[in-house]
């Protein structure tokens, strides 16, 4: 289990706020990165099926990516406050939705890499190993909970 320090949680919070400052741009970039890393992942998203490229200003895409980043941010705060990511109704539901959509364990490193690259681009010169580590810990701990819920739902 990976608790976060107050400093690490603050880094995640400030970079998440920068991400939120331009949701259309950053969510679009996130999905471009996901598909660069794993082109076949396109079929997992209803809003990407039948498209040749990642659509600009797509409300479903923005909402989905926004939720992903918000969940990681919330995981970071939980890790700083309690030392664990708490399983709640949202994460339980997420587990069963991911199973129904065909998400597999192998998809999690793809999302993690795209999140880290997106945040690195968002913060620019403020990127640091500590920021990378904080997002990594938060994502990894969140992924453990989601994977458990996926296994329970399967």
UniProtKB/Swiss-Prot annotation:
Cell compartments where the protein resides: Cytoplasm, Cytosol; Nucleus
GO molecular function list: heme binding; metal ion binding; oxygen binding; oxygen carrier activity
Tissue note: Root nodules.
UniProt cross-references to Pfam families, sorted A to Z: Globin
Induction summary: Repressed by nitrate in a dose-dependent manner.
Assembly notes: Monomer.
Family: Belongs to the plant globin family.
UniProt name for this protein: Leghemoglobin-2
Native source species: Lupinus luteus
Lineage: Eukaryota, Viridiplantae, Streptophyta, Embryophyta, Tracheophyta
């Amino acid at each position: 289990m990976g608790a976060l320090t107050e400093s690490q949680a603050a880094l995640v919070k400030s970079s998440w706020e920068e991400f939120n400052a331009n949701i259309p741009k950053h969510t679009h970039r996130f999905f471009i990165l996901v598909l660069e890393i794993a082109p076949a992942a396109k079929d997992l998203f209803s809003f990407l099926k039948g498209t040749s490229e990642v659509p600009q200003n797509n409300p479903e895409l923005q909402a989905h990516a926004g939720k992903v980043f918000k969940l990681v941010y919330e995981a970071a705060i939980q890790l700083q406050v309690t030392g664990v990511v708490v399983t709640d109704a949202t994460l339980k539901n997420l587990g069963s939705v991911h199973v129904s959509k065909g998400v597999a364990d192998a998809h999690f490193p793809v999302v993690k890499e795209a999140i880290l690259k997106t945040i690195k681009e968002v913060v620019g010169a403020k990127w640091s190993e500590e920021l990378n580590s904080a997002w990594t810990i938060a994502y990894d701990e969140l992924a453990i909970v989601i994977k458990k819920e996926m296994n329970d739902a399967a």
